[in-house]
Regions:
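Catalytic cores of Mg2+-dependent Asp-rich isoprenoid enzymes
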Residues: 1-157, 162, 166-273
Length: 273
């Protein structure tokens, strides 16, 4: 299996939202985006799948060295091999990849967030920076597109958090800010137990509205001159916003299930965006 094939298998499963967003990209940019997302999956899987925090820290430290090698050395991992020509072709920054690892490391140090600014920092590191990297690969002529890309990444992460409340709770994690829970009178223990209530639905209504506001904020920053180049992000936004609407339509049943869109609907959204 070549490094590119490994990345394809890791990051872009047929039917995933990401799969539909890159369908229309030229091959060179598609390979680059897939390599970046495969890297994100590798480091995210360490946090999600390695139960011993000290082992996870060691693995993340190894990836820090692999990133450095991808920018000027002899990397060992197939994802780092795939990244090596990408970072040169698109003049990407090593610091951005290290920041993504910083974000993943936050999951090893904390399982709660006091307020939204704390959560925004986490989202910036694990997703906003991914948006910035993606913008460089997709291309832009107006620097304000970077603001769009960063905020869109945060919107994507907020959507993931909403979709995965129950799944994260079963891992002992609550990403919804503690002051949001306090505002709606919900104890952390109720989330961990998977208890639905009117207060929980009110909380989730608030969280979905905030995520939608981040999409609005991102899209307002995208200049017309860069809309075509940034189409992959717009496709992802259309799919993820539809997912938020579906979650709300289902009554915010995110504690015991994972809402998703059908492949046909994703394809239709991608085609019309």
């Amino acid at each position: 299996m070549t490094p590119d094939e490994y990345c394809q298998q890791k990051a872009a499963r047929s039917g995933s939202s990401f799969y539909y967003s890159f369908l229309f990209l030229p091959p060179r940019k598609r390979r680059a985006i897939i390599a970046v997302y495969a890297f994100c999956r590798e480091v995210d899987d360490i946090v999600d799948e390695v139960s011993d925090a000290s082992v996870a820290r060691t693995k993340l430290a190894w990836w820090r060295r692999e990133v450095a090698q991808a920018f000027g050395g002899a990397p060992q991992h197939p994802v780092a091999h795939a990244l090596q020509p990408v970072v040169a072709q698109f003049v990407l920054r090593e610091a951005d990849f290290q920041t993504i690892i910083d974000g993943m490391a936050m999951d090893l140090e904390q399982s709660r967030f006091l307020d939204f600014p704390a959560l925004e920092l986490y989202c910036h590191r694990v997703a906003g920076v991914v948006g910035l990297i993606s913008a460089e690969i997709l291309g832009y002529v107006d620097p304000s597109t970077r603001g769009y890309a960063r905020d869109l990444g945060i919107a994507f992460q907020l959507t993931n958090i909403i979709r995965d409340v129950g799944e994260d709770a079963r891992r002992g994690r609550i990403y919804l800010p503690q002051d949001d829970l306090d505002r709606f009178g919900i104890a952390s223990s109720a989330i961990l137990r998977g208890e639905y209530s009117d207060a929980f639905r009110a909380l989730m209504t608030f969280e979905v509205e905030r995520a939608q506001q981040w999409y609005d904020r991102a899209l307002a920053q995208l200049p017309d001159a860069d809309r075509r180049a940034q189409r992959a992000g717009l496709i992802m936004a259309a799919i993820y916003r539809a997912l938020l609407s579906e979650i709300a339509r289902d009554g915010f049943l995110v504690l015991d299930r994972r809402t998703s869109l059908t492949p046909l609907r994703k394809l239709w959204l991608a085609w019309k965006t």
